[in-house]
Amino acid sequence: MPREEFPGEPTGHPGRHLPDDATASTATPASGRSPTAAPASGRPRIIALDVLRGFTLCEILFANIQLIADHGTAVVTQPMGDWDPWLGLPIFSLLFGIGFTLLLDSAADRVSRPRLVLLRRLVALLAIGLVHVVLWPGEILTRYAVVGLLVLLPSSWLPRWAVAGLAAVLVPVALWGGGGPLLIAGLFLLGSALARYGVADQIERSIRGPLLLGLVLTAGAATALWAHGQMEAGADPMQPSFTSSLADLLIAGVVVCALLVLLRTPLRPVLRVVFAPLGRMALTNYLTATLLVLAATHVLGLPIGQSLQVAFLAAGAILAAQWLLSALWLRRYRQGPLEWLWRWATWARRPPSSRVGT
């Protein structure tokens, strides 16, 4: 399954209005806004989530550019052999669950029916995905929207301990079955649970937690890779095993922890400049990347589907152009053009101007 995903729009702080979240309310006081307040957020963005989204968006394009170019029919050569190193699915699925819960909590401050806001958001995402799938059959927006409607939205009525418990069951079951929509559902729920327990609010404040967790995940990934090597003889190379899927998931966790640690070092400004603009305009960049890849293939005639070297050079050029345009756009506007339209559909009213300074 192609590893490409798009997360939600995480801003603000979680946990005040969802079931069984009373303990989280002390971390962030109620805003006191009227339920009819305009859908404009005054809460600060969580920069780490923007950086993670931007980093994973880059990985997505490198992982899928040959498939996009050949309409999903290319035989993609993995740079590291039979082991598939692409990590977009677990990272972005986790971010989608976090972003969904943060936005639901934000909506609860502003409207009397916050889940209706999220329902509109997911339906709009489904509509976008159904258009996008014509260009790129392997796109993930439709699956994210469907799993969100069937699993993530109903889970908002559950207490956070139940959401965490469901995630703890679904993720290993999905790994045993080779991934797919069940893994997306499990990671959505895991992200939602992390947000509702306040973890998303703390990731900017601590280096010890991500560092220790990263070391544990590294040990687990090394063990899973060793076990996969022991079991590889006689196994079907086209069928992912539990150990290889587990290793993918744990390595994705290591990457997340490593980025969170680096964001607490002098490299933070560099990471923010490089990845945050891409992450803040993730939907716009995700969709326009498909158009640019198809144009490079069918208009310019680049052999992206036949040459891994050409594919990676093209991906790098596309990301560089998107970074430049994103950085320039965000100097004048608070969000990307498609993000603004998605917000319009989410709140069922025209958002206020997204110009900086208005």
Task: Go through each PLM region and give its residues.
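Alpha-helical transmembrane segments and their immediate juxtamembrane cytosolic regions
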Residues: 2-358
